[in-house]
Amino acid sequence: MPRLLDSVAVARERWSEAPGAIEVVVVDNASTDLTAAVAEERGCRVVEVQERRIASVRNGGAAVAGGEILCFVDADSQIHPETFIAIERSLATGRVVAGSTGVWMERWSLGIALTWALFMPLVWLTRMDTGVVFCRREDFEAIGGYDERRFFGEDVQLLWDLRRIGRKGNQRLTRLRTVKALGSTRKFDLHGDWHYFSDLFGLLPKMLWSPRASSEFADKYWYGKQRTPER
């Protein structure tokens, strides 16, 4: 997280308005490290969310944020120095309801590159990407925020819902490709560069039909947690 906060500090300084107008909220999701202490030392607002579900974490941060524009990013990412400038310009056109920056991975291999290539056609087709995801607060609240019933895929559902309400005002999703975030390869480091092909795709049908399987996968993949088997 320190690398993320360093990159946010640079991007705040680049913004044309007062840097202090950009509030940084860090959600402490039952961490066992120094997440909260580091964030507070850096002047961030810290909120605790015990529920280990990414949608709940993001909604918890949005609930205490005071800004009219909301931006969401993972703690192991780094944002581009021009991020806030690009977001402000994009939303100021009035033609954009929400968007994302996309990511450039911090390292590459054949497995990571093929995984990236597999998903890119869907990204191009839908304009839904990862990295820094942003929208107006009023639109976020209009759709009810992130869907907390979902164990994963909450970011896709959020952008899908925002695109739906944007159509009413002739607004669209956008991808800010010139300000890509630097994405962490932590999951590839942990599970292997080919794990999407060897593990995840095989589990997908089961997860789509079984809420318990989805919950168990989310606990293991994002939190490294094994549930106690039911007796």
Where are the model-predicted features located?
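Short, well-formed alpha-helical segments that are part of the catalytic scaffolds
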Residues: 1-16
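A conserved acidic beta->alpha catalytic loop
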Residues: 7, 28-36, 77
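Acidic donor-binding/catalytic loop of UDP-sugar-dependent glycosyltransferases
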Residues: 34, 73-90, 160
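Glycine-rich, basic loop-to-helix element that forms the pyrophosphate-binding segment
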Residues: 49-65
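Short aromatic/hydrophobic "clamp" motif used to bind/position activated sugar donors
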Residues: 70
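Conserved donor NDP-sugar-binding/catalytic core segment of glycosyltransferases
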Residues: 81-111
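A short, conserved alpha-helix in the catalytic core of glycosyltransferases
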Residues: 139-142, 149-170, 174-176
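Hydrophobic helical membrane-anchoring modules
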Residues: 164-231
